[in-house]
Amino acid sequence: MIAHLVLYELRPDISGADRAHFLAALEHAITTIPTVRGVRFGRRHMIGARYEALAEPAFTFFALFEFDDVAGLQAYLAHASHVALGQLFWSCCVRTLVFDYELAGPDAIATMKSW
């Protein structure tokens, strides 16, 4: 499996209407692009650990999209719903980091040893 990880920070002045439009486009993309296998979203939670100070600049939100393979991710990236989401994303966010990862299978330790 391939994970597409997006860390992002919304504009501090984003309007409620713009935020709703962004979320609607996000929902449309994840429900209409057939290669998306799983999606998780999160909001940063601070617990006072020392490592938190090392993560600057911090990102408030993340989105994690899962695909069967690289071809599935590439199909997602090229899909019209993702292209539309991407254009809207840049008008709603001030910064982002995006990474793609190969996920370990059921025997994660064995997979990690092979890396």
Regions found by a protein language model. Name each.
Residues 41-55, 87-115:
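Glycine-rich beta-strand-turn "strand-cap" elements at beta-sheet edges
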Residues 10-12, 43, 67-69, 105:
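Non-catalytic surface loops within mature trypsin-like serine protease
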Residues 2-10, 62:
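Active-site-flanking beta-strand signature of metal-NTP-handling nucleotidyl enzymes
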Residues 1-2, 55-57:
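Short, flexible turn/loop "capping" segments at secondary-structure junctions
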Residues 14, 25, 31-36, 56-60, ...:
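An amphipathic, aromatic/His-enriched active-site/gating alpha helix that lines ligand/cofactor pockets
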Residues 19-21:
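Core segments of cupin and vicinal oxygen chelate
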